[in-house]
Amino acid sequence: MPSISTNITLAFTIALTGMLVFRSHLMSSLLCLEGMMLAMFILSILFIMNLHYTVSFIMPILLLVLAACEAAIGLALLVMVSNTYGLDHIQNLNLLQC
């Protein structure tokens, strides 16, 4: 079991590193953020299953719902920025202010 949690933690760390390295493009940042949320989802499932703490089975599902909302808002921003400016650079998000 420690090897699975180590691999998932490594996947989270790689996604976090990708978020820091590829922070200029919105699509790359969204993909790295989704990888981080998926790793957190799997780690929370493993944590709950190891402790046999069945009361908190709702927490990973809540995390998945929040990840879906984050993805929807991120994709809406991506479509708005790419339709307005033709690029998906994060610096263009500052130009969308009223």
Swiss-Prot record:
Keyword Cytoplasm carried by entry: no
Enzyme class, first EC level, given as a word: translocase
Keywords: Electron transport, Membrane, Mitochondrion, Mitochondrion inner membrane, NAD, Respiratory chain, Translocase, Transmembrane, Transmembrane helix, Transport, Ubiquinone
Chief localization: mitochondrion
Gene: MT-ND4L
Residues that span the membrane, as ranges: 2-22, 29-49, 61-81
Job of this protein: Core subunit of the mitochondrial membrane respiratory chain NADH dehydrogenase (Complex I) which catalyzes electron transfer from NADH through the respiratory chain, using ubiquinone as an electron acceptor. Part of the enzyme membrane arm which is embedded in the lipid bilayer and involved in proton translocation.
Reactions catalysed, as given in the entry: a ubiquinone + NADH + 5 H(+)(in) = a ubiquinol + NAD(+) + 4 H(+)(out)
Subunit text: Core subunit of respiratory chain NADH dehydrogenase (Complex I) which is composed of 45 different subunits.
EC numbers, comma separated: 7.1.1.2
GO CC terms in record: mitochondrial inner membrane; respiratory chain complex I
Compartments in which it is found: Mitochondrion inner membrane
Molecular function as annotated in GO: NADH dehydrogenase (ubiquinone) activity
Gene3D superfamilies: 1.10.287.3510
Protein's recorded name: NADH-ubiquinone oxidoreductase chain 4L
PANTHER family named among the record's database cross-references: NADH-UBIQUINONE OXIDOREDUCTASE CHAIN 4L, NADH-UBIQUINONE OXIDOREDUCTASE SUBUNIT ND4L
Biological processes per GO annotation: ATP synthesis coupled electron transport
Bilayer topology: Multi-pass membrane protein
Family recorded in the similarity comment: Belongs to the complex I subunit 4L family.
